[in-house]
Structure formats: structure tokens, C-alpha cells
């Protein structure tokens, strides 16, 4: 079946035609070492590279190869949150309303595209999706735009959400067969979330999966009424992962709305705060698992669902793992959503236990109150959107974590409060890089950061290395097996995306963003 599905995908995509700079669909399934063709490197979300020319033995010889500062003009002040894509020696990355193509060897600009935005939240953009000779990206004012790779000229644009309802768009599109998968953002008004599939040729809508069910549909029993569902939230602002053999997209959904005051939405509020498996061809829900039922702490469960095959109790299983914002680590059978492991990866205090499905049970005592409730983790979460990594070589799941507390309080006790209906104030926090054993859920090692906590993307490689950022604006390399610090470079600003690596002309490059600048590192001078 896997072979048949791959052949069908190849048949469709061959009709697109592949020019000299184009992306072959095979690289999305098993990327070559000279590319980073999609948001997580491949469909799995592992952010693991088989490259090892840069390794634990020679890391101290790493040098700066080039620097590229993105200067979009105007009042845009956003950091580079996008993961750069590398295809045939060209790197593509985004800021809100902007796309650049640069030489991946030198950092020289090839072209720069600017979208004339009509508004929207310019908080960040997580990148582009590419297939064939076509690039796709989302804009803050709710459009999906397609460009040609060679010159950056616009092919088409399509509206994917309603700016007047305070939606905006920031996710990196994912291409699965003949589907461009796009999500939406927005917490300022009580609006429902959804995921869409768009045609690569025209941008026309193929299907839409709504996070909130309709009255009478499965999941509607977890809401008090139709009005609560119609305003229920659950944004889809981080890219999905994809299993081509099962033809399932794996999506983490955001928090319900109103965000803090949950009095008017009693129940678990499906399918917000869920890991959802969705058929890529039909948009139908195959299964779901809910890390944070009835969330009232803004703990979006959008963290990357990482896919890998592993051994559990002596048997090979198709697995999915997520280090969720609520402080809990989950391993699921990705064929059916059944729970395999549930464990804390930071100490939390918001649950009263774990139910038979492996889902944490919220403690009523930790619900936001008029006089406040002290809750761990804080609103920023034990993890956030920043991508984790999984190494098949070590069997460890790597995630930047934060242990922190917030006092959550409501200021509007009405069932239909104004805005979020409450807020939080954070206090003590500590940050750390953690390696989790997927077989047990235990933290194998933890590397604590000095100073304040923070969230940073992660990359692991066959060179026995893990790359990430720290609160002191350093780009850091750790030993993948022990967590020992091996190397760092101060970038002058915090790491703002997930690092990537690729090899061109025999040289392995590492690229990371800090603020508005891309930094490329390599072993120079034949070292």
C-alpha cells in the first residue's frame, strides 16, 4: 500500500513538471542530505539529520560561514520564526509579508518578494511550503500566496480566513500529495479554528476540517450548546506532520475560547487542545487524543506531533510523541491514537490524576479564580511552538523546557465574558534542555540554562550533537547522549527558529536565525 500511495503522489506531481531548481516529491519522503525541503526536514517532524561531518569530536573547529540580515523595510519588527528550506543550493525563508531566496552557500540574495498586506497580526511567520517549481506561504491578512521558485513572481493568491473576524495566518504550509495544508490563527475574538486543504495549481479549497463539531456530531456532547461551539477557538497555527503510508495528517490544535474564563463552555471542548489524525484526501477525522481537556490556561496543544517507529515491550510500533505545553509527554500509537505513555517532563500541579485514556484530568482547584490560582506550568508553557527533535540513533526526544508558575485569575465571571475573561502573572521560572526516553517517558538527562527561561527550536544529528538556543543569546551544541555542553556562539539575539543543516559541495552547513538575521556555520579551511 505504501508503494501504491507513493506512486500515486509521484504521478500527480510529475504533471507539475520539475525545473532545475524544483523540488522532487521523493525528497519530502526521504530528503537527501543536500536539502531541507519542508518545515521539519521531512514529513515525520523528527528534525534529525544523518549528516555527521560536524560532530562531537570536531565541533570546536566550527566557524561562521556567512550572515544574512533580513531588512524588509517599513515598520516590521518581527524575528525570523520561519524554518528555512533548502533545495538545489537555494535557501527560502519568510517574515510576515516577505519571502527571500538566497544562495545557501554564500548567503547572497537571489530575489525578495513583498506582499502588500491589508493588516493582520504580524507576530511572525513559520515558513513556506514547496513542491515542484512552486512555493506557498501564508500572510497575516489571511491569504495563501503561491510564487514561482525561479524569480519569486506571484502565481496566485487565495483568501483562507476572514481578517474582519480577527483571524490571521502564520503557519508554514505542508504539502501532502496534491494538497497544500494550511492553518489559521486568532485569539482576539471568540472564533472557531479549522484546517484547510488547497489545490497547488489554483489555490481552490479542496476540503476543510472544523475543530469544533456541528450540533449532533461526535464531540458536540463536550460543549454545553451550539453557541459555545461556534465561538470555541482551537486555532491551527503550527504545521502538521504526515504519514504517507497511513495517509494521515497529525495536527495539534489550540486552546478553546474564551481563553481563561471557561464558565460558559463546560465540558472537554473537543476538538480543541487535541492531537488530531486527519485523512489527507478527505479531511475526515480518523482519531483524536486530548492532552488538555477543558483548558483554561492558554496551553495550546500545537506542539509538533513527532512520528517514528519504535519498540514497545519488545514489539515494533508506529508511534507519535508530543511534549505538550501543559508539561506532559505523550506517546501514542499513530495508527489509532491509543495511549502508550503519559508522563510529566516538568513538575506540574494542575491535574488530579490521569484517566483510563492516558489524558490528564484537570484539578478544579487550579481553575482561574477571582482571587487567583497558583499554577504550574505558566502561561508560556513547559514547551511552546518551537520544534523539538527525535534521534533514531539515541532513541531520545529532545525538547527545550520551562518550569514556571503563573497566578491565573478571572476578572469577568460572566458566562460570556469580554475578551479572554481573565489573565495571568508569571513568577519563578527555570529553563532546561531535556532528553526524554520514549519507551518510559523518563527524562534521561536535563541540561539547565543559566538565567531566565526560554523556548528554542532543536536539531539533532548523526554527529552525536543536539543544537538549540539558550537564554543568553547563544547557539549551543550539546552531546546528544549526555547533555554536556560542547560549543556555543553568541548571536546577539535569542535563537528564534529551529536550526537546520545541509551539505553542499562536501561542506556541511548549520543555519539558525536570531532576531532578524540568519547565521550559517561550517567547517572552513578543510577542517
Residue ranges and their predicted role:
Residues 28-31, 57-58, 103-105, 242-244, ...:
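Extracellular/periplasmic catalytic domains that process cell-envelope and extracellular macromolecules
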Residues 57-71, 99-120, 131, 143-164, ...:
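Extracytoplasmic/lumenal domain signature
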Residues 20-52:
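N-terminal pre-domain segments of enzymes
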Residues 44-69, 73, 83:
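Non-catalytic accessory segments flanking enzyme active sites
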Residues 7-17:
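Bacterial N-terminal signal peptides
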Residues 36-40, 78-97, 120-144, 168-192, ...:
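Repeat-blade elements of multi-bladed beta-propeller folds
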Residues 1-5:
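Positively charged n-region of N-terminal signal peptides that target proteins for export
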Residues 37, 43-49, 73-77, 259-260, ...:
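Short, solvent-exposed loop/turn elements at domain surfaces
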